[in-house]
From Swiss-Prot:
It comes from the Bacteria. One of its GO terms (cellular component) is proton-transporting ATP synthase complex. One of its GO terms (molecular function) is proton-transporting ATP synthase activity, rotational mechanism. The gene is atpH. Belongs to the ATPase delta chain family. The lineage of its organism: Bacteria, Pseudomonadati, Pseudomonadota, Betaproteobacteria, Burkholderiales. Its main location: membrane. F-type ATPases have 2 components, F(1) - the catalytic core - and F(0) - the membrane proton channel. F(1) has five subunits: alpha(3), beta(3), gamma(1), delta(1), epsilon(1). F(0) has three main subunits: a(1), b(2) and c(10-14). The alpha and beta chains form an alternating ring which encloses part of the gamma chain. F(1) is attached to F(0) by a central stalk formed by the gamma and epsilon chains, while a peripheral stalk is formed by the delta and b chains. It is a peripheral membrane protein. This is ATP synthase subunit delta. Keywords: ATP synthesis, Cell inner membrane, Cell membrane, CF(1), Hydrogen ion transport, Ion transport, Membrane, Transport. SUPFAM superfamilies: N-terminal domain of the delta subunit of the F1F0-ATP synthase (SSF47928).
Amino acid sequence: MAELATVARPYAEALFRVAKAGNLGAWSELVSEMGQIAAVPDMKAVADDPKLSKADVAGIFLSALKSPVSHEAKELVGLLVANKRLSLLPEIAAQFHVLRNASEGAADVEITSAFPLEGAPLTDLVATLERKFGKKLQPHVTVDPSLIGGVRVQVGDEVLDTSVRARLAQMQSALTAA
């Protein structure tokens, strides 16, 4: 996994430089879509098919995109296909997203809640977390009933776990240590 990230990083950084010089929002959508399409098993099979030429693979991939494709994006796909690295696109997209967040002073926040969290409670929680972390946060909410109550929040490497399950685990640890 680390090797994949290492190989994908220069592509993501170069792509980010090109995107910053143009329309970053449009590039973000395109790169995200490219990563999703490259992750589809059928597309992986097409990329690995020895009967198809590199131009055919690039053409099939580009035809699957719904977003407008710039000359630079076509060049990137051609380069990745030529080097048999089309499978790197999901990792390139992930690293591109991290670079964009860093340039905007933003971050993704993974919020796991025991119950569905939306509307005003979610907005209030995100606002509180933005003050704590000093960043604009983009929430991704999942529901995990095993938390019993409360939330588990992860921003980058930092985790805040205020769930009932975590508190019970702390109590168990304290009681068994005594």
